[in-house]
Amino acid sequence: MLCYVTRPDAVLMEVEVEAKANGEDCLNQVCRRLGIIEVDYFGLQFTGSKGESLWLNLRNRISQQMDGLAPYRLKLRVKFFVEPHLILQEQTRHIFFLHIKEALLAGHLLCSPEQAVELSALLAQTKFGDYNQNTAKYNYEELCAKELSSATLNSIVAKHKELEGTSQASAEYQVLQIVSAMENYGIEWHSVRDSEGQKLLIGVGPEGISICKDDFSPINRIAYPVVQMATQSGKNVYLTVTKESGNSIVLLFKMISTRAASGLYRAITETHAFYRCDTVTSAVMMQYSRDLKGHLASLFLNENINLGKKYVFDIKRTSKEVYDHARRALYNAGVVDLVSRNNQSPSHSPLKSSESSMNCSSCEGLSCQQTRVLQEKLRKLKEAMLCMVCCEEEINSTFCPCGHTVCCESCAAQLQSCPVCRSRVEHVQHVYLPTHTSLLNLTVI
């Protein structure tokens, strides 16, 4: 089955997947080709029959979510925005930048005149490099998506001159830094109507839910702690909110389609889980519906059967867990080379550090196979003995009374609950383990 995936820079990627593939299979293949490990920040969007933008549920089959027949057209988009310093890969940062650039040009991110000038100069630096007097005025106007006055153009040019010597990657990072401080950063907007039929925009973001007029002028802002419950019924989404008086009020939002309503319901639940929770609860992970065939099969065969099961949410990790997972993945990707450089074993050791032993991936000789097996065992041993929070220091502390031993002393001192079982930590006990450093005479990487 063929899928056409459009990147934020309008480059089209052809992705071939199995006919029964889930959305996750397609996204993983796209990110693998782009060299991106931080997959959890991204999603695949498509356009519904009524023009609504919808997120593909990565845990369900692609063919069951899309209209028509393959090839299916999808868009690679950033689903969860985080602070730029939390992004570990330059490839990930570049896709974030492309998405932000698109949002700026579309007017979805409101900024001050000073910010607009600075961002325009940085965008010029990313596209043209250092200032050149031959750069035409229309090139700057194209970047800003509007006609510029002489004063504004001169301000942008002056800022652009100051950026001489700034690399493209550095300029992109500065753009992300400026935009991440804006009020609407990371907010996903949904077009709705209220109970009286008035057009509104609902913004679902890291801190809460924004209600605006269709020109983005704010009406109300609802923080997550006062949201009791979000539910969906057909084309309607209901939000139960606690007022300052302590009473509850139910807000009704009418959507253009049932799928659009499902999209808003998903956005509220998944965004809250990603930014505000320590881990994704099983209540969110395991919520699903069944089609008629699956419902009958669950009644007469086995209620745990997967036939016809469609998951409501596809979020797997919170922002903290994504960062931790990415650090571990990057650490593991480079650990073999680092181990070989640091190892000073004698020449007869199967762990000897030699250029030939590290560059013979196609060799099937017994000694090379033994080397790779031992290196993999060493990698797993080193990872198992590292703090699960910082991934840098060795484990040397036990949480009491639960007894889990998974953190270093500095991280354990900052935790109020055990990261494994979530039970309350009464005190932390220092322990002395036979660590890999002392056993193998290696330096912790």
From Swiss-Prot:
Region Critical for homodimerization, annotated ranges: 431-433
Signal sequence segment: none
Tissue spec. comment: Ubiquitously expressed.
Keyword Coiled coil: no
Induction: Expression is directly activated by NR1H2 and NR1H3. Expression is not dependent of the sterol-response element-binding proteins (SREBPs). Expression is indirectly induced by LDL.
UniProt keyword annotation of Secreted present: no
Pathway: Protein modification; protein ubiquitination
Localization in the cell: Cytoplasm; Cell membrane
GO cellular component annotations of the record: cytoskeleton; cytosol; plasma membrane
SMART domains tied to this protein: B41 (SM00295), FERM_C (SM01196)
Post-translational modification as stated in the protein's UniProt record: Autoubiquitinated.
UniProt xrefs under InterPro entries: Band_41_domain, Ez/rad/moesin-like, FERM/acyl-CoA-bd_prot_sf, FERM_2, FERM_central, FERM_domain, FERM_N, FERM_PH-like_C
Gene Ontology terms: biological process: cholesterol homeostasis; negative regulation of low-density lipoprotein particle clearance; negative regulation of neuron projection development; nervous system development; positive regulation of protein catabolic process; protein destabilization; protein ubiquitination; regulation of low-density lipoprotein particle receptor catabolic process
Protein name in UniProt: E3 ubiquitin-protein ligase MYLIP
Zinc finger extent (RING-type): 387-422
Entry GO MF terms: cytoskeletal protein binding; ubiquitin protein ligase activity; ubiquitin-protein transferase activity; zinc ion binding
Catalytic reaction annotation: S-ubiquitinyl-[E2 ubiquitin-conjugating enzyme]-L-cysteine + [acceptor protein]-L-lysine = [E2 ubiquitin-conjugating enzyme]-L-cysteine + N(6)-ubiquitinyl-[acceptor protein]-L-lysine
Record's comment describing the protein's domains: The RING domain mediates ubiquitination and the neurite outgrowth inhibitory activity. The FERM domain binds phospholipids and mediates lipoprotein receptors recognition at the plasma membrane through their cytoplasmic tails.
Catalytic EC class: transferase
Documented activity regulation: Can bind 1 iron ion per dimer. Iron binding seems to decrease LDLR degradation activity.
Membrane topology: Peripheral membrane protein
Species for this entry: Homo sapiens (Human)
Residues annotated as binding Fe cation: 360, 363, 368
Quaternary assembly: Homodimer. Interacts with the E2 ubiquitin-conjugating enzyme, UBE2D1 (via RING-type zinc finger). Interacts with myosin regulatory light chain (MRLC) and TMEM4.
EC number: 2.3.2.27
Function statement: E3 ubiquitin-protein ligase that mediates ubiquitination and subsequent proteasomal degradation of myosin regulatory light chain (MRLC), LDLR, VLDLR and LRP8. Activity depends on E2 enzymes of the UBE2D family. Proteasomal degradation of MRLC leads to inhibit neurite outgrowth in presence of NGF by counteracting the stabilization of MRLC by saposin-like protein (CNPY2/MSAP) and reducing CNPY2-stimulated neurite outgrowth. Acts as a sterol-dependent inhibitor of cellular cholesterol uptake by mediating ubiquitination and subsequent degradation of LDLR.
